[in-house]
Amino acid sequence: MEARGKVVGVIGNLVTIEIVGTVSMNEIVFIKTGGRSLKAEIIRIRDGEVDAQVFEMTKGIAVGDDIEFTDKLLTVELGPGLLSQVYDGLQNPLSELAAQCGFFLERGLYLSALDRSKKWSFNATAKVGDIVVAGDYLGFVVEGTIKHKIMVPFYRKDSYKIVEIVSDGNYTVDDKIAVIENDAGGRHVITMSFHWPVKVPITSYKDRLIPSEPMVTQTRIIDTFFPVAKGGTFCIPGPFGAGKTVLQQVTSRNADVDVVIIAACGERAGEVVETLKEFPELIDPRTGKSLMDRTCIICNTSSMPVAAREASVYTAITIGEYYRQMGLDILLLADSTSRWAQAMREMSGRLEEIPGEEAFPAYLESVIASFYERAGIVVLNDGNVGSVTVGGSVSPAGGNFEEPVTQATLKVVGAFHGLTRERSDARKFPAINPLESWSKYRGVVESEKTGYARSFLAKGNEINQMMKVVGEEGISIGDFLVYLKSELLDACYLQQNSFDSVDTAVSPERQNYMFDILYDILQSDFKFENKLEARSFVNELRQNILDMNLNPFKEEKFNKLENTLKDLVRSKKLDF
C-alpha cells in the first residue's frame, strides 16, 4: 500500500508526520509547503506516526501539509565529474546553485550532482560475452589526472553476461554504455552514473587488509613520530586557532594519495570560504596543476541546517569509497566532527531521548565508530588494492581532550595528533604535542630510534618544569644539556615551516637522513666548562640544522652546511 501522510507537529527542524501505510527507516520524504517540496529523512517510526529531520529551514511548514514518500534512502550520484566540484551535504553543486539563486540559497531547490550535457571520452576494456559482477570494470574515462573506471553498479548482486557494449567514443553520463543479462534472462542498461545510499558501506571487493604501508604526508612530526597508514584512521583534536585547518590543507597538498575529499561539516563560514578560495590556487606538487583537479569538497557551514551536517559526512565517505573501488588511494578529511556530533545532540534533544554525557546521545560512540570503520584498505575484484584513509579534526571546547567526542574518537582511530594551545601560542607549528600524541602504525623511521627520541623529549620536559621552580642554577650541567638537546630536536625536527618551498614537504629519504644526524647528537656526550658555553654551542647547532632544512637536499649548500655541522660536533664530542 502506498504511504500517505500529513504534518501534525513541528519542533525546530524535526517534523512529526501522521501516516497511513508502510514506510522504512531513513526513507526520504518531501514536505509540500508554500509551493515548494522540502527534503527530509525519517529518523524514528512510531505507531501511526514518524519523525523526520528536515534538511532545510522549516519556516512556513504547517499542520496539515501533505507529504510525498519516495521509498528511497538518502543517496549520492556516483560517476565521472565529481572531482574539482564543491557540493553541499545533499550533493547540490554550489556553483550552479549560486548561478540560479545568487548569494542566498532558495529552499526546496535540488540540482543534479553531475553535468548531464558534458561528453566523456569512453574507452571500453570489457567485451561482449564477458561475465561481470558488481564493481567490475567495463571501461574508463579520463577525469583530470586519473583514469575514472566505469563499473557495474554496486547494487547488482548477481553474476551477469555482457550482451552489448558501446564502441570507444564520446558519451554523456546518461547515455547507454552497456547492456548486461543475468541467468534468468533479465537485462539491465548500464550508464556511466548510478546512485548509492550514503549510510550503506560499499562492499564490492574481495578482501579487506590490515593497514600497514605508511601514508607519507611529508610532515616530519607525523611521518616519523605519529605516522598514518594507508587505509588507516587518525584524528586531530585541538582548540580554536591551534592550526587544525592549516595542518589538514598541508596534508592534503603533500600526502601520497590520488584523490582528496574534504568534508567541511559545520565549520565557521569564514574558514570554509578560505578553503574554497585557497584550494583552486594551490598547486599539486605531483602534476603541476591545480590541487582542485583531484579534490572534491563537501561543505556545510555552521549557518546551514544541522541535519545537512550529518549528510555531508556520509556523502563524503561514500564518494571516497567509490574512488577506492578504482584501485586509488583516497584521503578524506572531515573538519570538524565535533560539529557533526553537536548536530546529533540537537536532534537527540528534540526526539526527547535519554541524554548521555554532556547531553550527547548515548549512541554517540557507535555512530562515530561506524563512520571511521568505513576507512580501510581492500583487495578489489581484479586484484588491485584501493584505500580510504580518514582523518577527522575535533574541536573540543577549551581544548579539553576529556570531553565525549574526543574520547569516543580516540577509541576507534589508529593515530592521535593532539594540538595544544601551549605550542601554538609559542608559535611551534605544527602544534602537535609530542608527549600526548600517539600512533599504532609503522612510520618511515625505525621505532627504536623514535622511541629513544620521545623519551629524550619527555626527560627534557621534566627538566624544563624543574627549571621553572629552581632556575638554571639549581640543576646539573648534565641535566641542562639533556634539556638543550630536547629543545634542539623540537626546533629542528618537530617544527616545520609550511610557507617555505623546501621545508613544507620533506621526503622520507630526507627525514631518515636528518633524523640520523639528530639521533647521533642526542646519543653523543659533550664536554663543556659551563652552561653558557653549552647553550652557545647548541644554539650554533640549531641554526646550522635550520639552515639545512631550508636548502634542497644534498645540493652544494646543503652539503657545505652538513660538513660545518660535523666539524662543530666533532670539536666538542667526548671520545671513548
UniProtKB/Swiss-Prot annotation:
Task: Drop me one GO molecular function for this one.
Answer: ATP binding
Which superkingdom heads the taxonomic lineage of this protein's source? Bacteria
Which UniProt keywords are present, listed alphabetically? ATP synthesis, ATP-binding, Hydrogen ion transport, Ion transport, Nucleotide-binding, Translocase, Transport
Q: What intrachain disulfides are recorded?
A: none
Which PROSITE patterns does this chain map to?
ATPASE_ALPHA_BETA (PS00152)
Give the EC number(s) under which this enzyme is classified: 7.1.2.2
Reactions it catalyzes = ATP + H2O + 4 H(+)(in) = ADP + phosphate + 5 H(+)(out)
Q: Would the keyword Iron-sulfur be found if you checked this record's keyword annotation? A: no
- In which residues is ATP bound? 238-245
Question: Pfam family example for this protein?
Answer: ATP-synt_ab
Example GO BP = proton motive force-driven plasma membrane ATP synthesis
Q: Which residues form a coiled coil?
A: none
State the family it belongs to.
Belongs to the ATPase alpha/beta chains family.
**Entry function:** Produces ATP from ADP in the presence of a proton gradient across the membrane. The V-type alpha chain is a catalytic subunit.
What this protein is called in its record is: V-type ATP synthase alpha chain
The organism of origin for this protein: Borrelia turicatae (strain 91E135)
Q: What is the lineage of its organism?
A: Bacteria, Pseudomonadati, Spirochaetota, Spirochaetia, Spirochaetales
Q: Which gene encodes it?
A: atpA
